[in-house]
């Protein structure tokens, strides 16, 4: 007889599960290269796992406080020496007054694990000299957001954290991340770091995707290919799913090697190969009119536009496919 794979099957709940989780708040953090998302999980009255995204407070592009599920992984220091994290900082990407490594920082997640010492000597924030510093400061802000949101929603202040990471995050990268969390009293052990493809698979079979169930046949050991394309990495993982008398278990049997391939690379390609040539053409200039350093500054200012162009192109492609009716 076939079994349907659900979170309840994947995580066998002991009879005293509710008693074990009572008085605790379980928070999952998707620490992304470009965007961070936080969710809270709980058991409903039927013992099923339920999760919901937290709306995190942050300043918008106009400086007003807003709440949103998506927190851009961007830090900036404004002209009043005030720290800005999230959407407000993201809106400053491309602003000529904000120079990467001086008063705005992003994509620092992918630089963890590189013991190169201070990287940003011109930083206007004394506490941000390397990617590890930026990560610590980002999590300080994130922790405050999580605690405030949990308090406002009546959740317990006893928060247990889990953080998703690229599938092949190396040991030194994990070490830097754990140190950044520990520096902010966010107790996370190495076992609470979950590979992003595994997290994507769990999300796939969660209650939000009841229409996309996976049926397991007895006597068969199916394998699932998980393709996780993020801003900083492209992770591919093959999971093996087994059914036994004790329930359903999964394990990784193959994981792609870590590689710097992701959405940010597409942004840079668009900026260098589409936006920059068009900008130079409209101003009767060529690349020879600028130094390599000047071109890098210009391209960095175009990255925000490139990302928006990429997103709009993807949305247009989805709409086009939805509009096409193929013959049966």
Feature map (PLM): residue ranges:
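Phosphate/ATP-binding catalytic cores across multiple sugar-kinase/actin-like superfamilies
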Residues: 6-13, 18, 22, 137-153, ...
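Short acidic, glycine/serine/threonine-rich loops at helix termini
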Residues: 40, 173-177, 202-206, 237-239
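Phosphate-binding loop and its immediate beta->loop->alpha context
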Residues: 52-184, 266-328
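Hydrophobic, small-residue-rich alpha-helical packing segments that form membrane-like cores
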Residues: 150, 167, 177-221, 229-230, ...
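Extended hydrophobic secondary-structure segments that form protein cores and membrane-embedded regions
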Residues: 27-29, 159-166, 193, 224-228, ...
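Gly/Thr-rich phosphate-binding beta-strand-loop-beta motif of the actin/hexokinase/Hsp70
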Residues: 17-49, 101-103, 209-251
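Nucleic acid-processing catalytic cores of prokaryotic defense/repair systems
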Residues: 1-82, 159-160, 168, 191-193, ...
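Charge-patterned, long linear interaction tracts outside catalytic cores
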Residues: 243-261, 310
């Amino acid at each position: 007889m076939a079994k349907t794979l659900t979170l309840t099957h994947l995580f066998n709940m002991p009879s005293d599960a509710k008693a074990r989780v009572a008085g605790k708040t379980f928070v999952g953090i998707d620490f992304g290269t470009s965007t961070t998302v936080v969710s809270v999980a709980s058991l409903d009255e039927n013992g099923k796992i339920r999760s919901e995204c937290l709306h995190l407070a942050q300043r918008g592009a106009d400086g007003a406080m807003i709440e949103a599920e998506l927190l851009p992984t961007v830090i900036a220091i404004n002209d009043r020496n005030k720290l800005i994290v999230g959407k407000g900082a993201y809106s400053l990407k491309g602003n000529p007054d904000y120079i990467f490594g001086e008063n705005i920082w992003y994509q620092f997640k992918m630089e963890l694990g590189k013991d190169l010492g201070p990287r940003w000597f011109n930083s206007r924030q004394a506490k941000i000299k390397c990617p590890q510093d930026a990560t610590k400061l980002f999590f300080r802000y994130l922790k405050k957001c999580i605690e405030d949101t949990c308090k406002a929603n009546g959740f317990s202040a006893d928060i247990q954290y889990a953080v998703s990471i690229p599938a092949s995050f190396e040991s030194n990268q994990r070490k830097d991340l754990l140190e950044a969390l520990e520096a902010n009293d966010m107790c996370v052990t190495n076992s609470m770091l979950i590979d992003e493809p595994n997290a994507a698979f769990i999300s796939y079979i969660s209650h939000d995707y009841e229409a996309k169930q996976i049926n397991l046949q007895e006597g068969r050991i199916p394998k699932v290919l998980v393709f996780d394309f993020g801003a900083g990495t492209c992770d591919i993982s093959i999971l093996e799913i087994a059914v036994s008398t004790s329930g359903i278990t999964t394990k990784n049997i193959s994981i792609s090697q870590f590689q710097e391939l992701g959405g940010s690379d597409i942004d840079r390609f668009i900026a260098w190969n589409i936006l920059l040539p068009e900008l130079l053409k409209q101003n009767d200039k060529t690349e020879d009119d600028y130094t390599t350093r000047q071109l890098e500054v210009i391209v960095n200012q175009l990255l925000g536009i490139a990302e928006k162009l990429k997103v709009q192109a993807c949305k247009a492609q989805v709409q086009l496919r939805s509009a096409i009716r193929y013959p049966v």
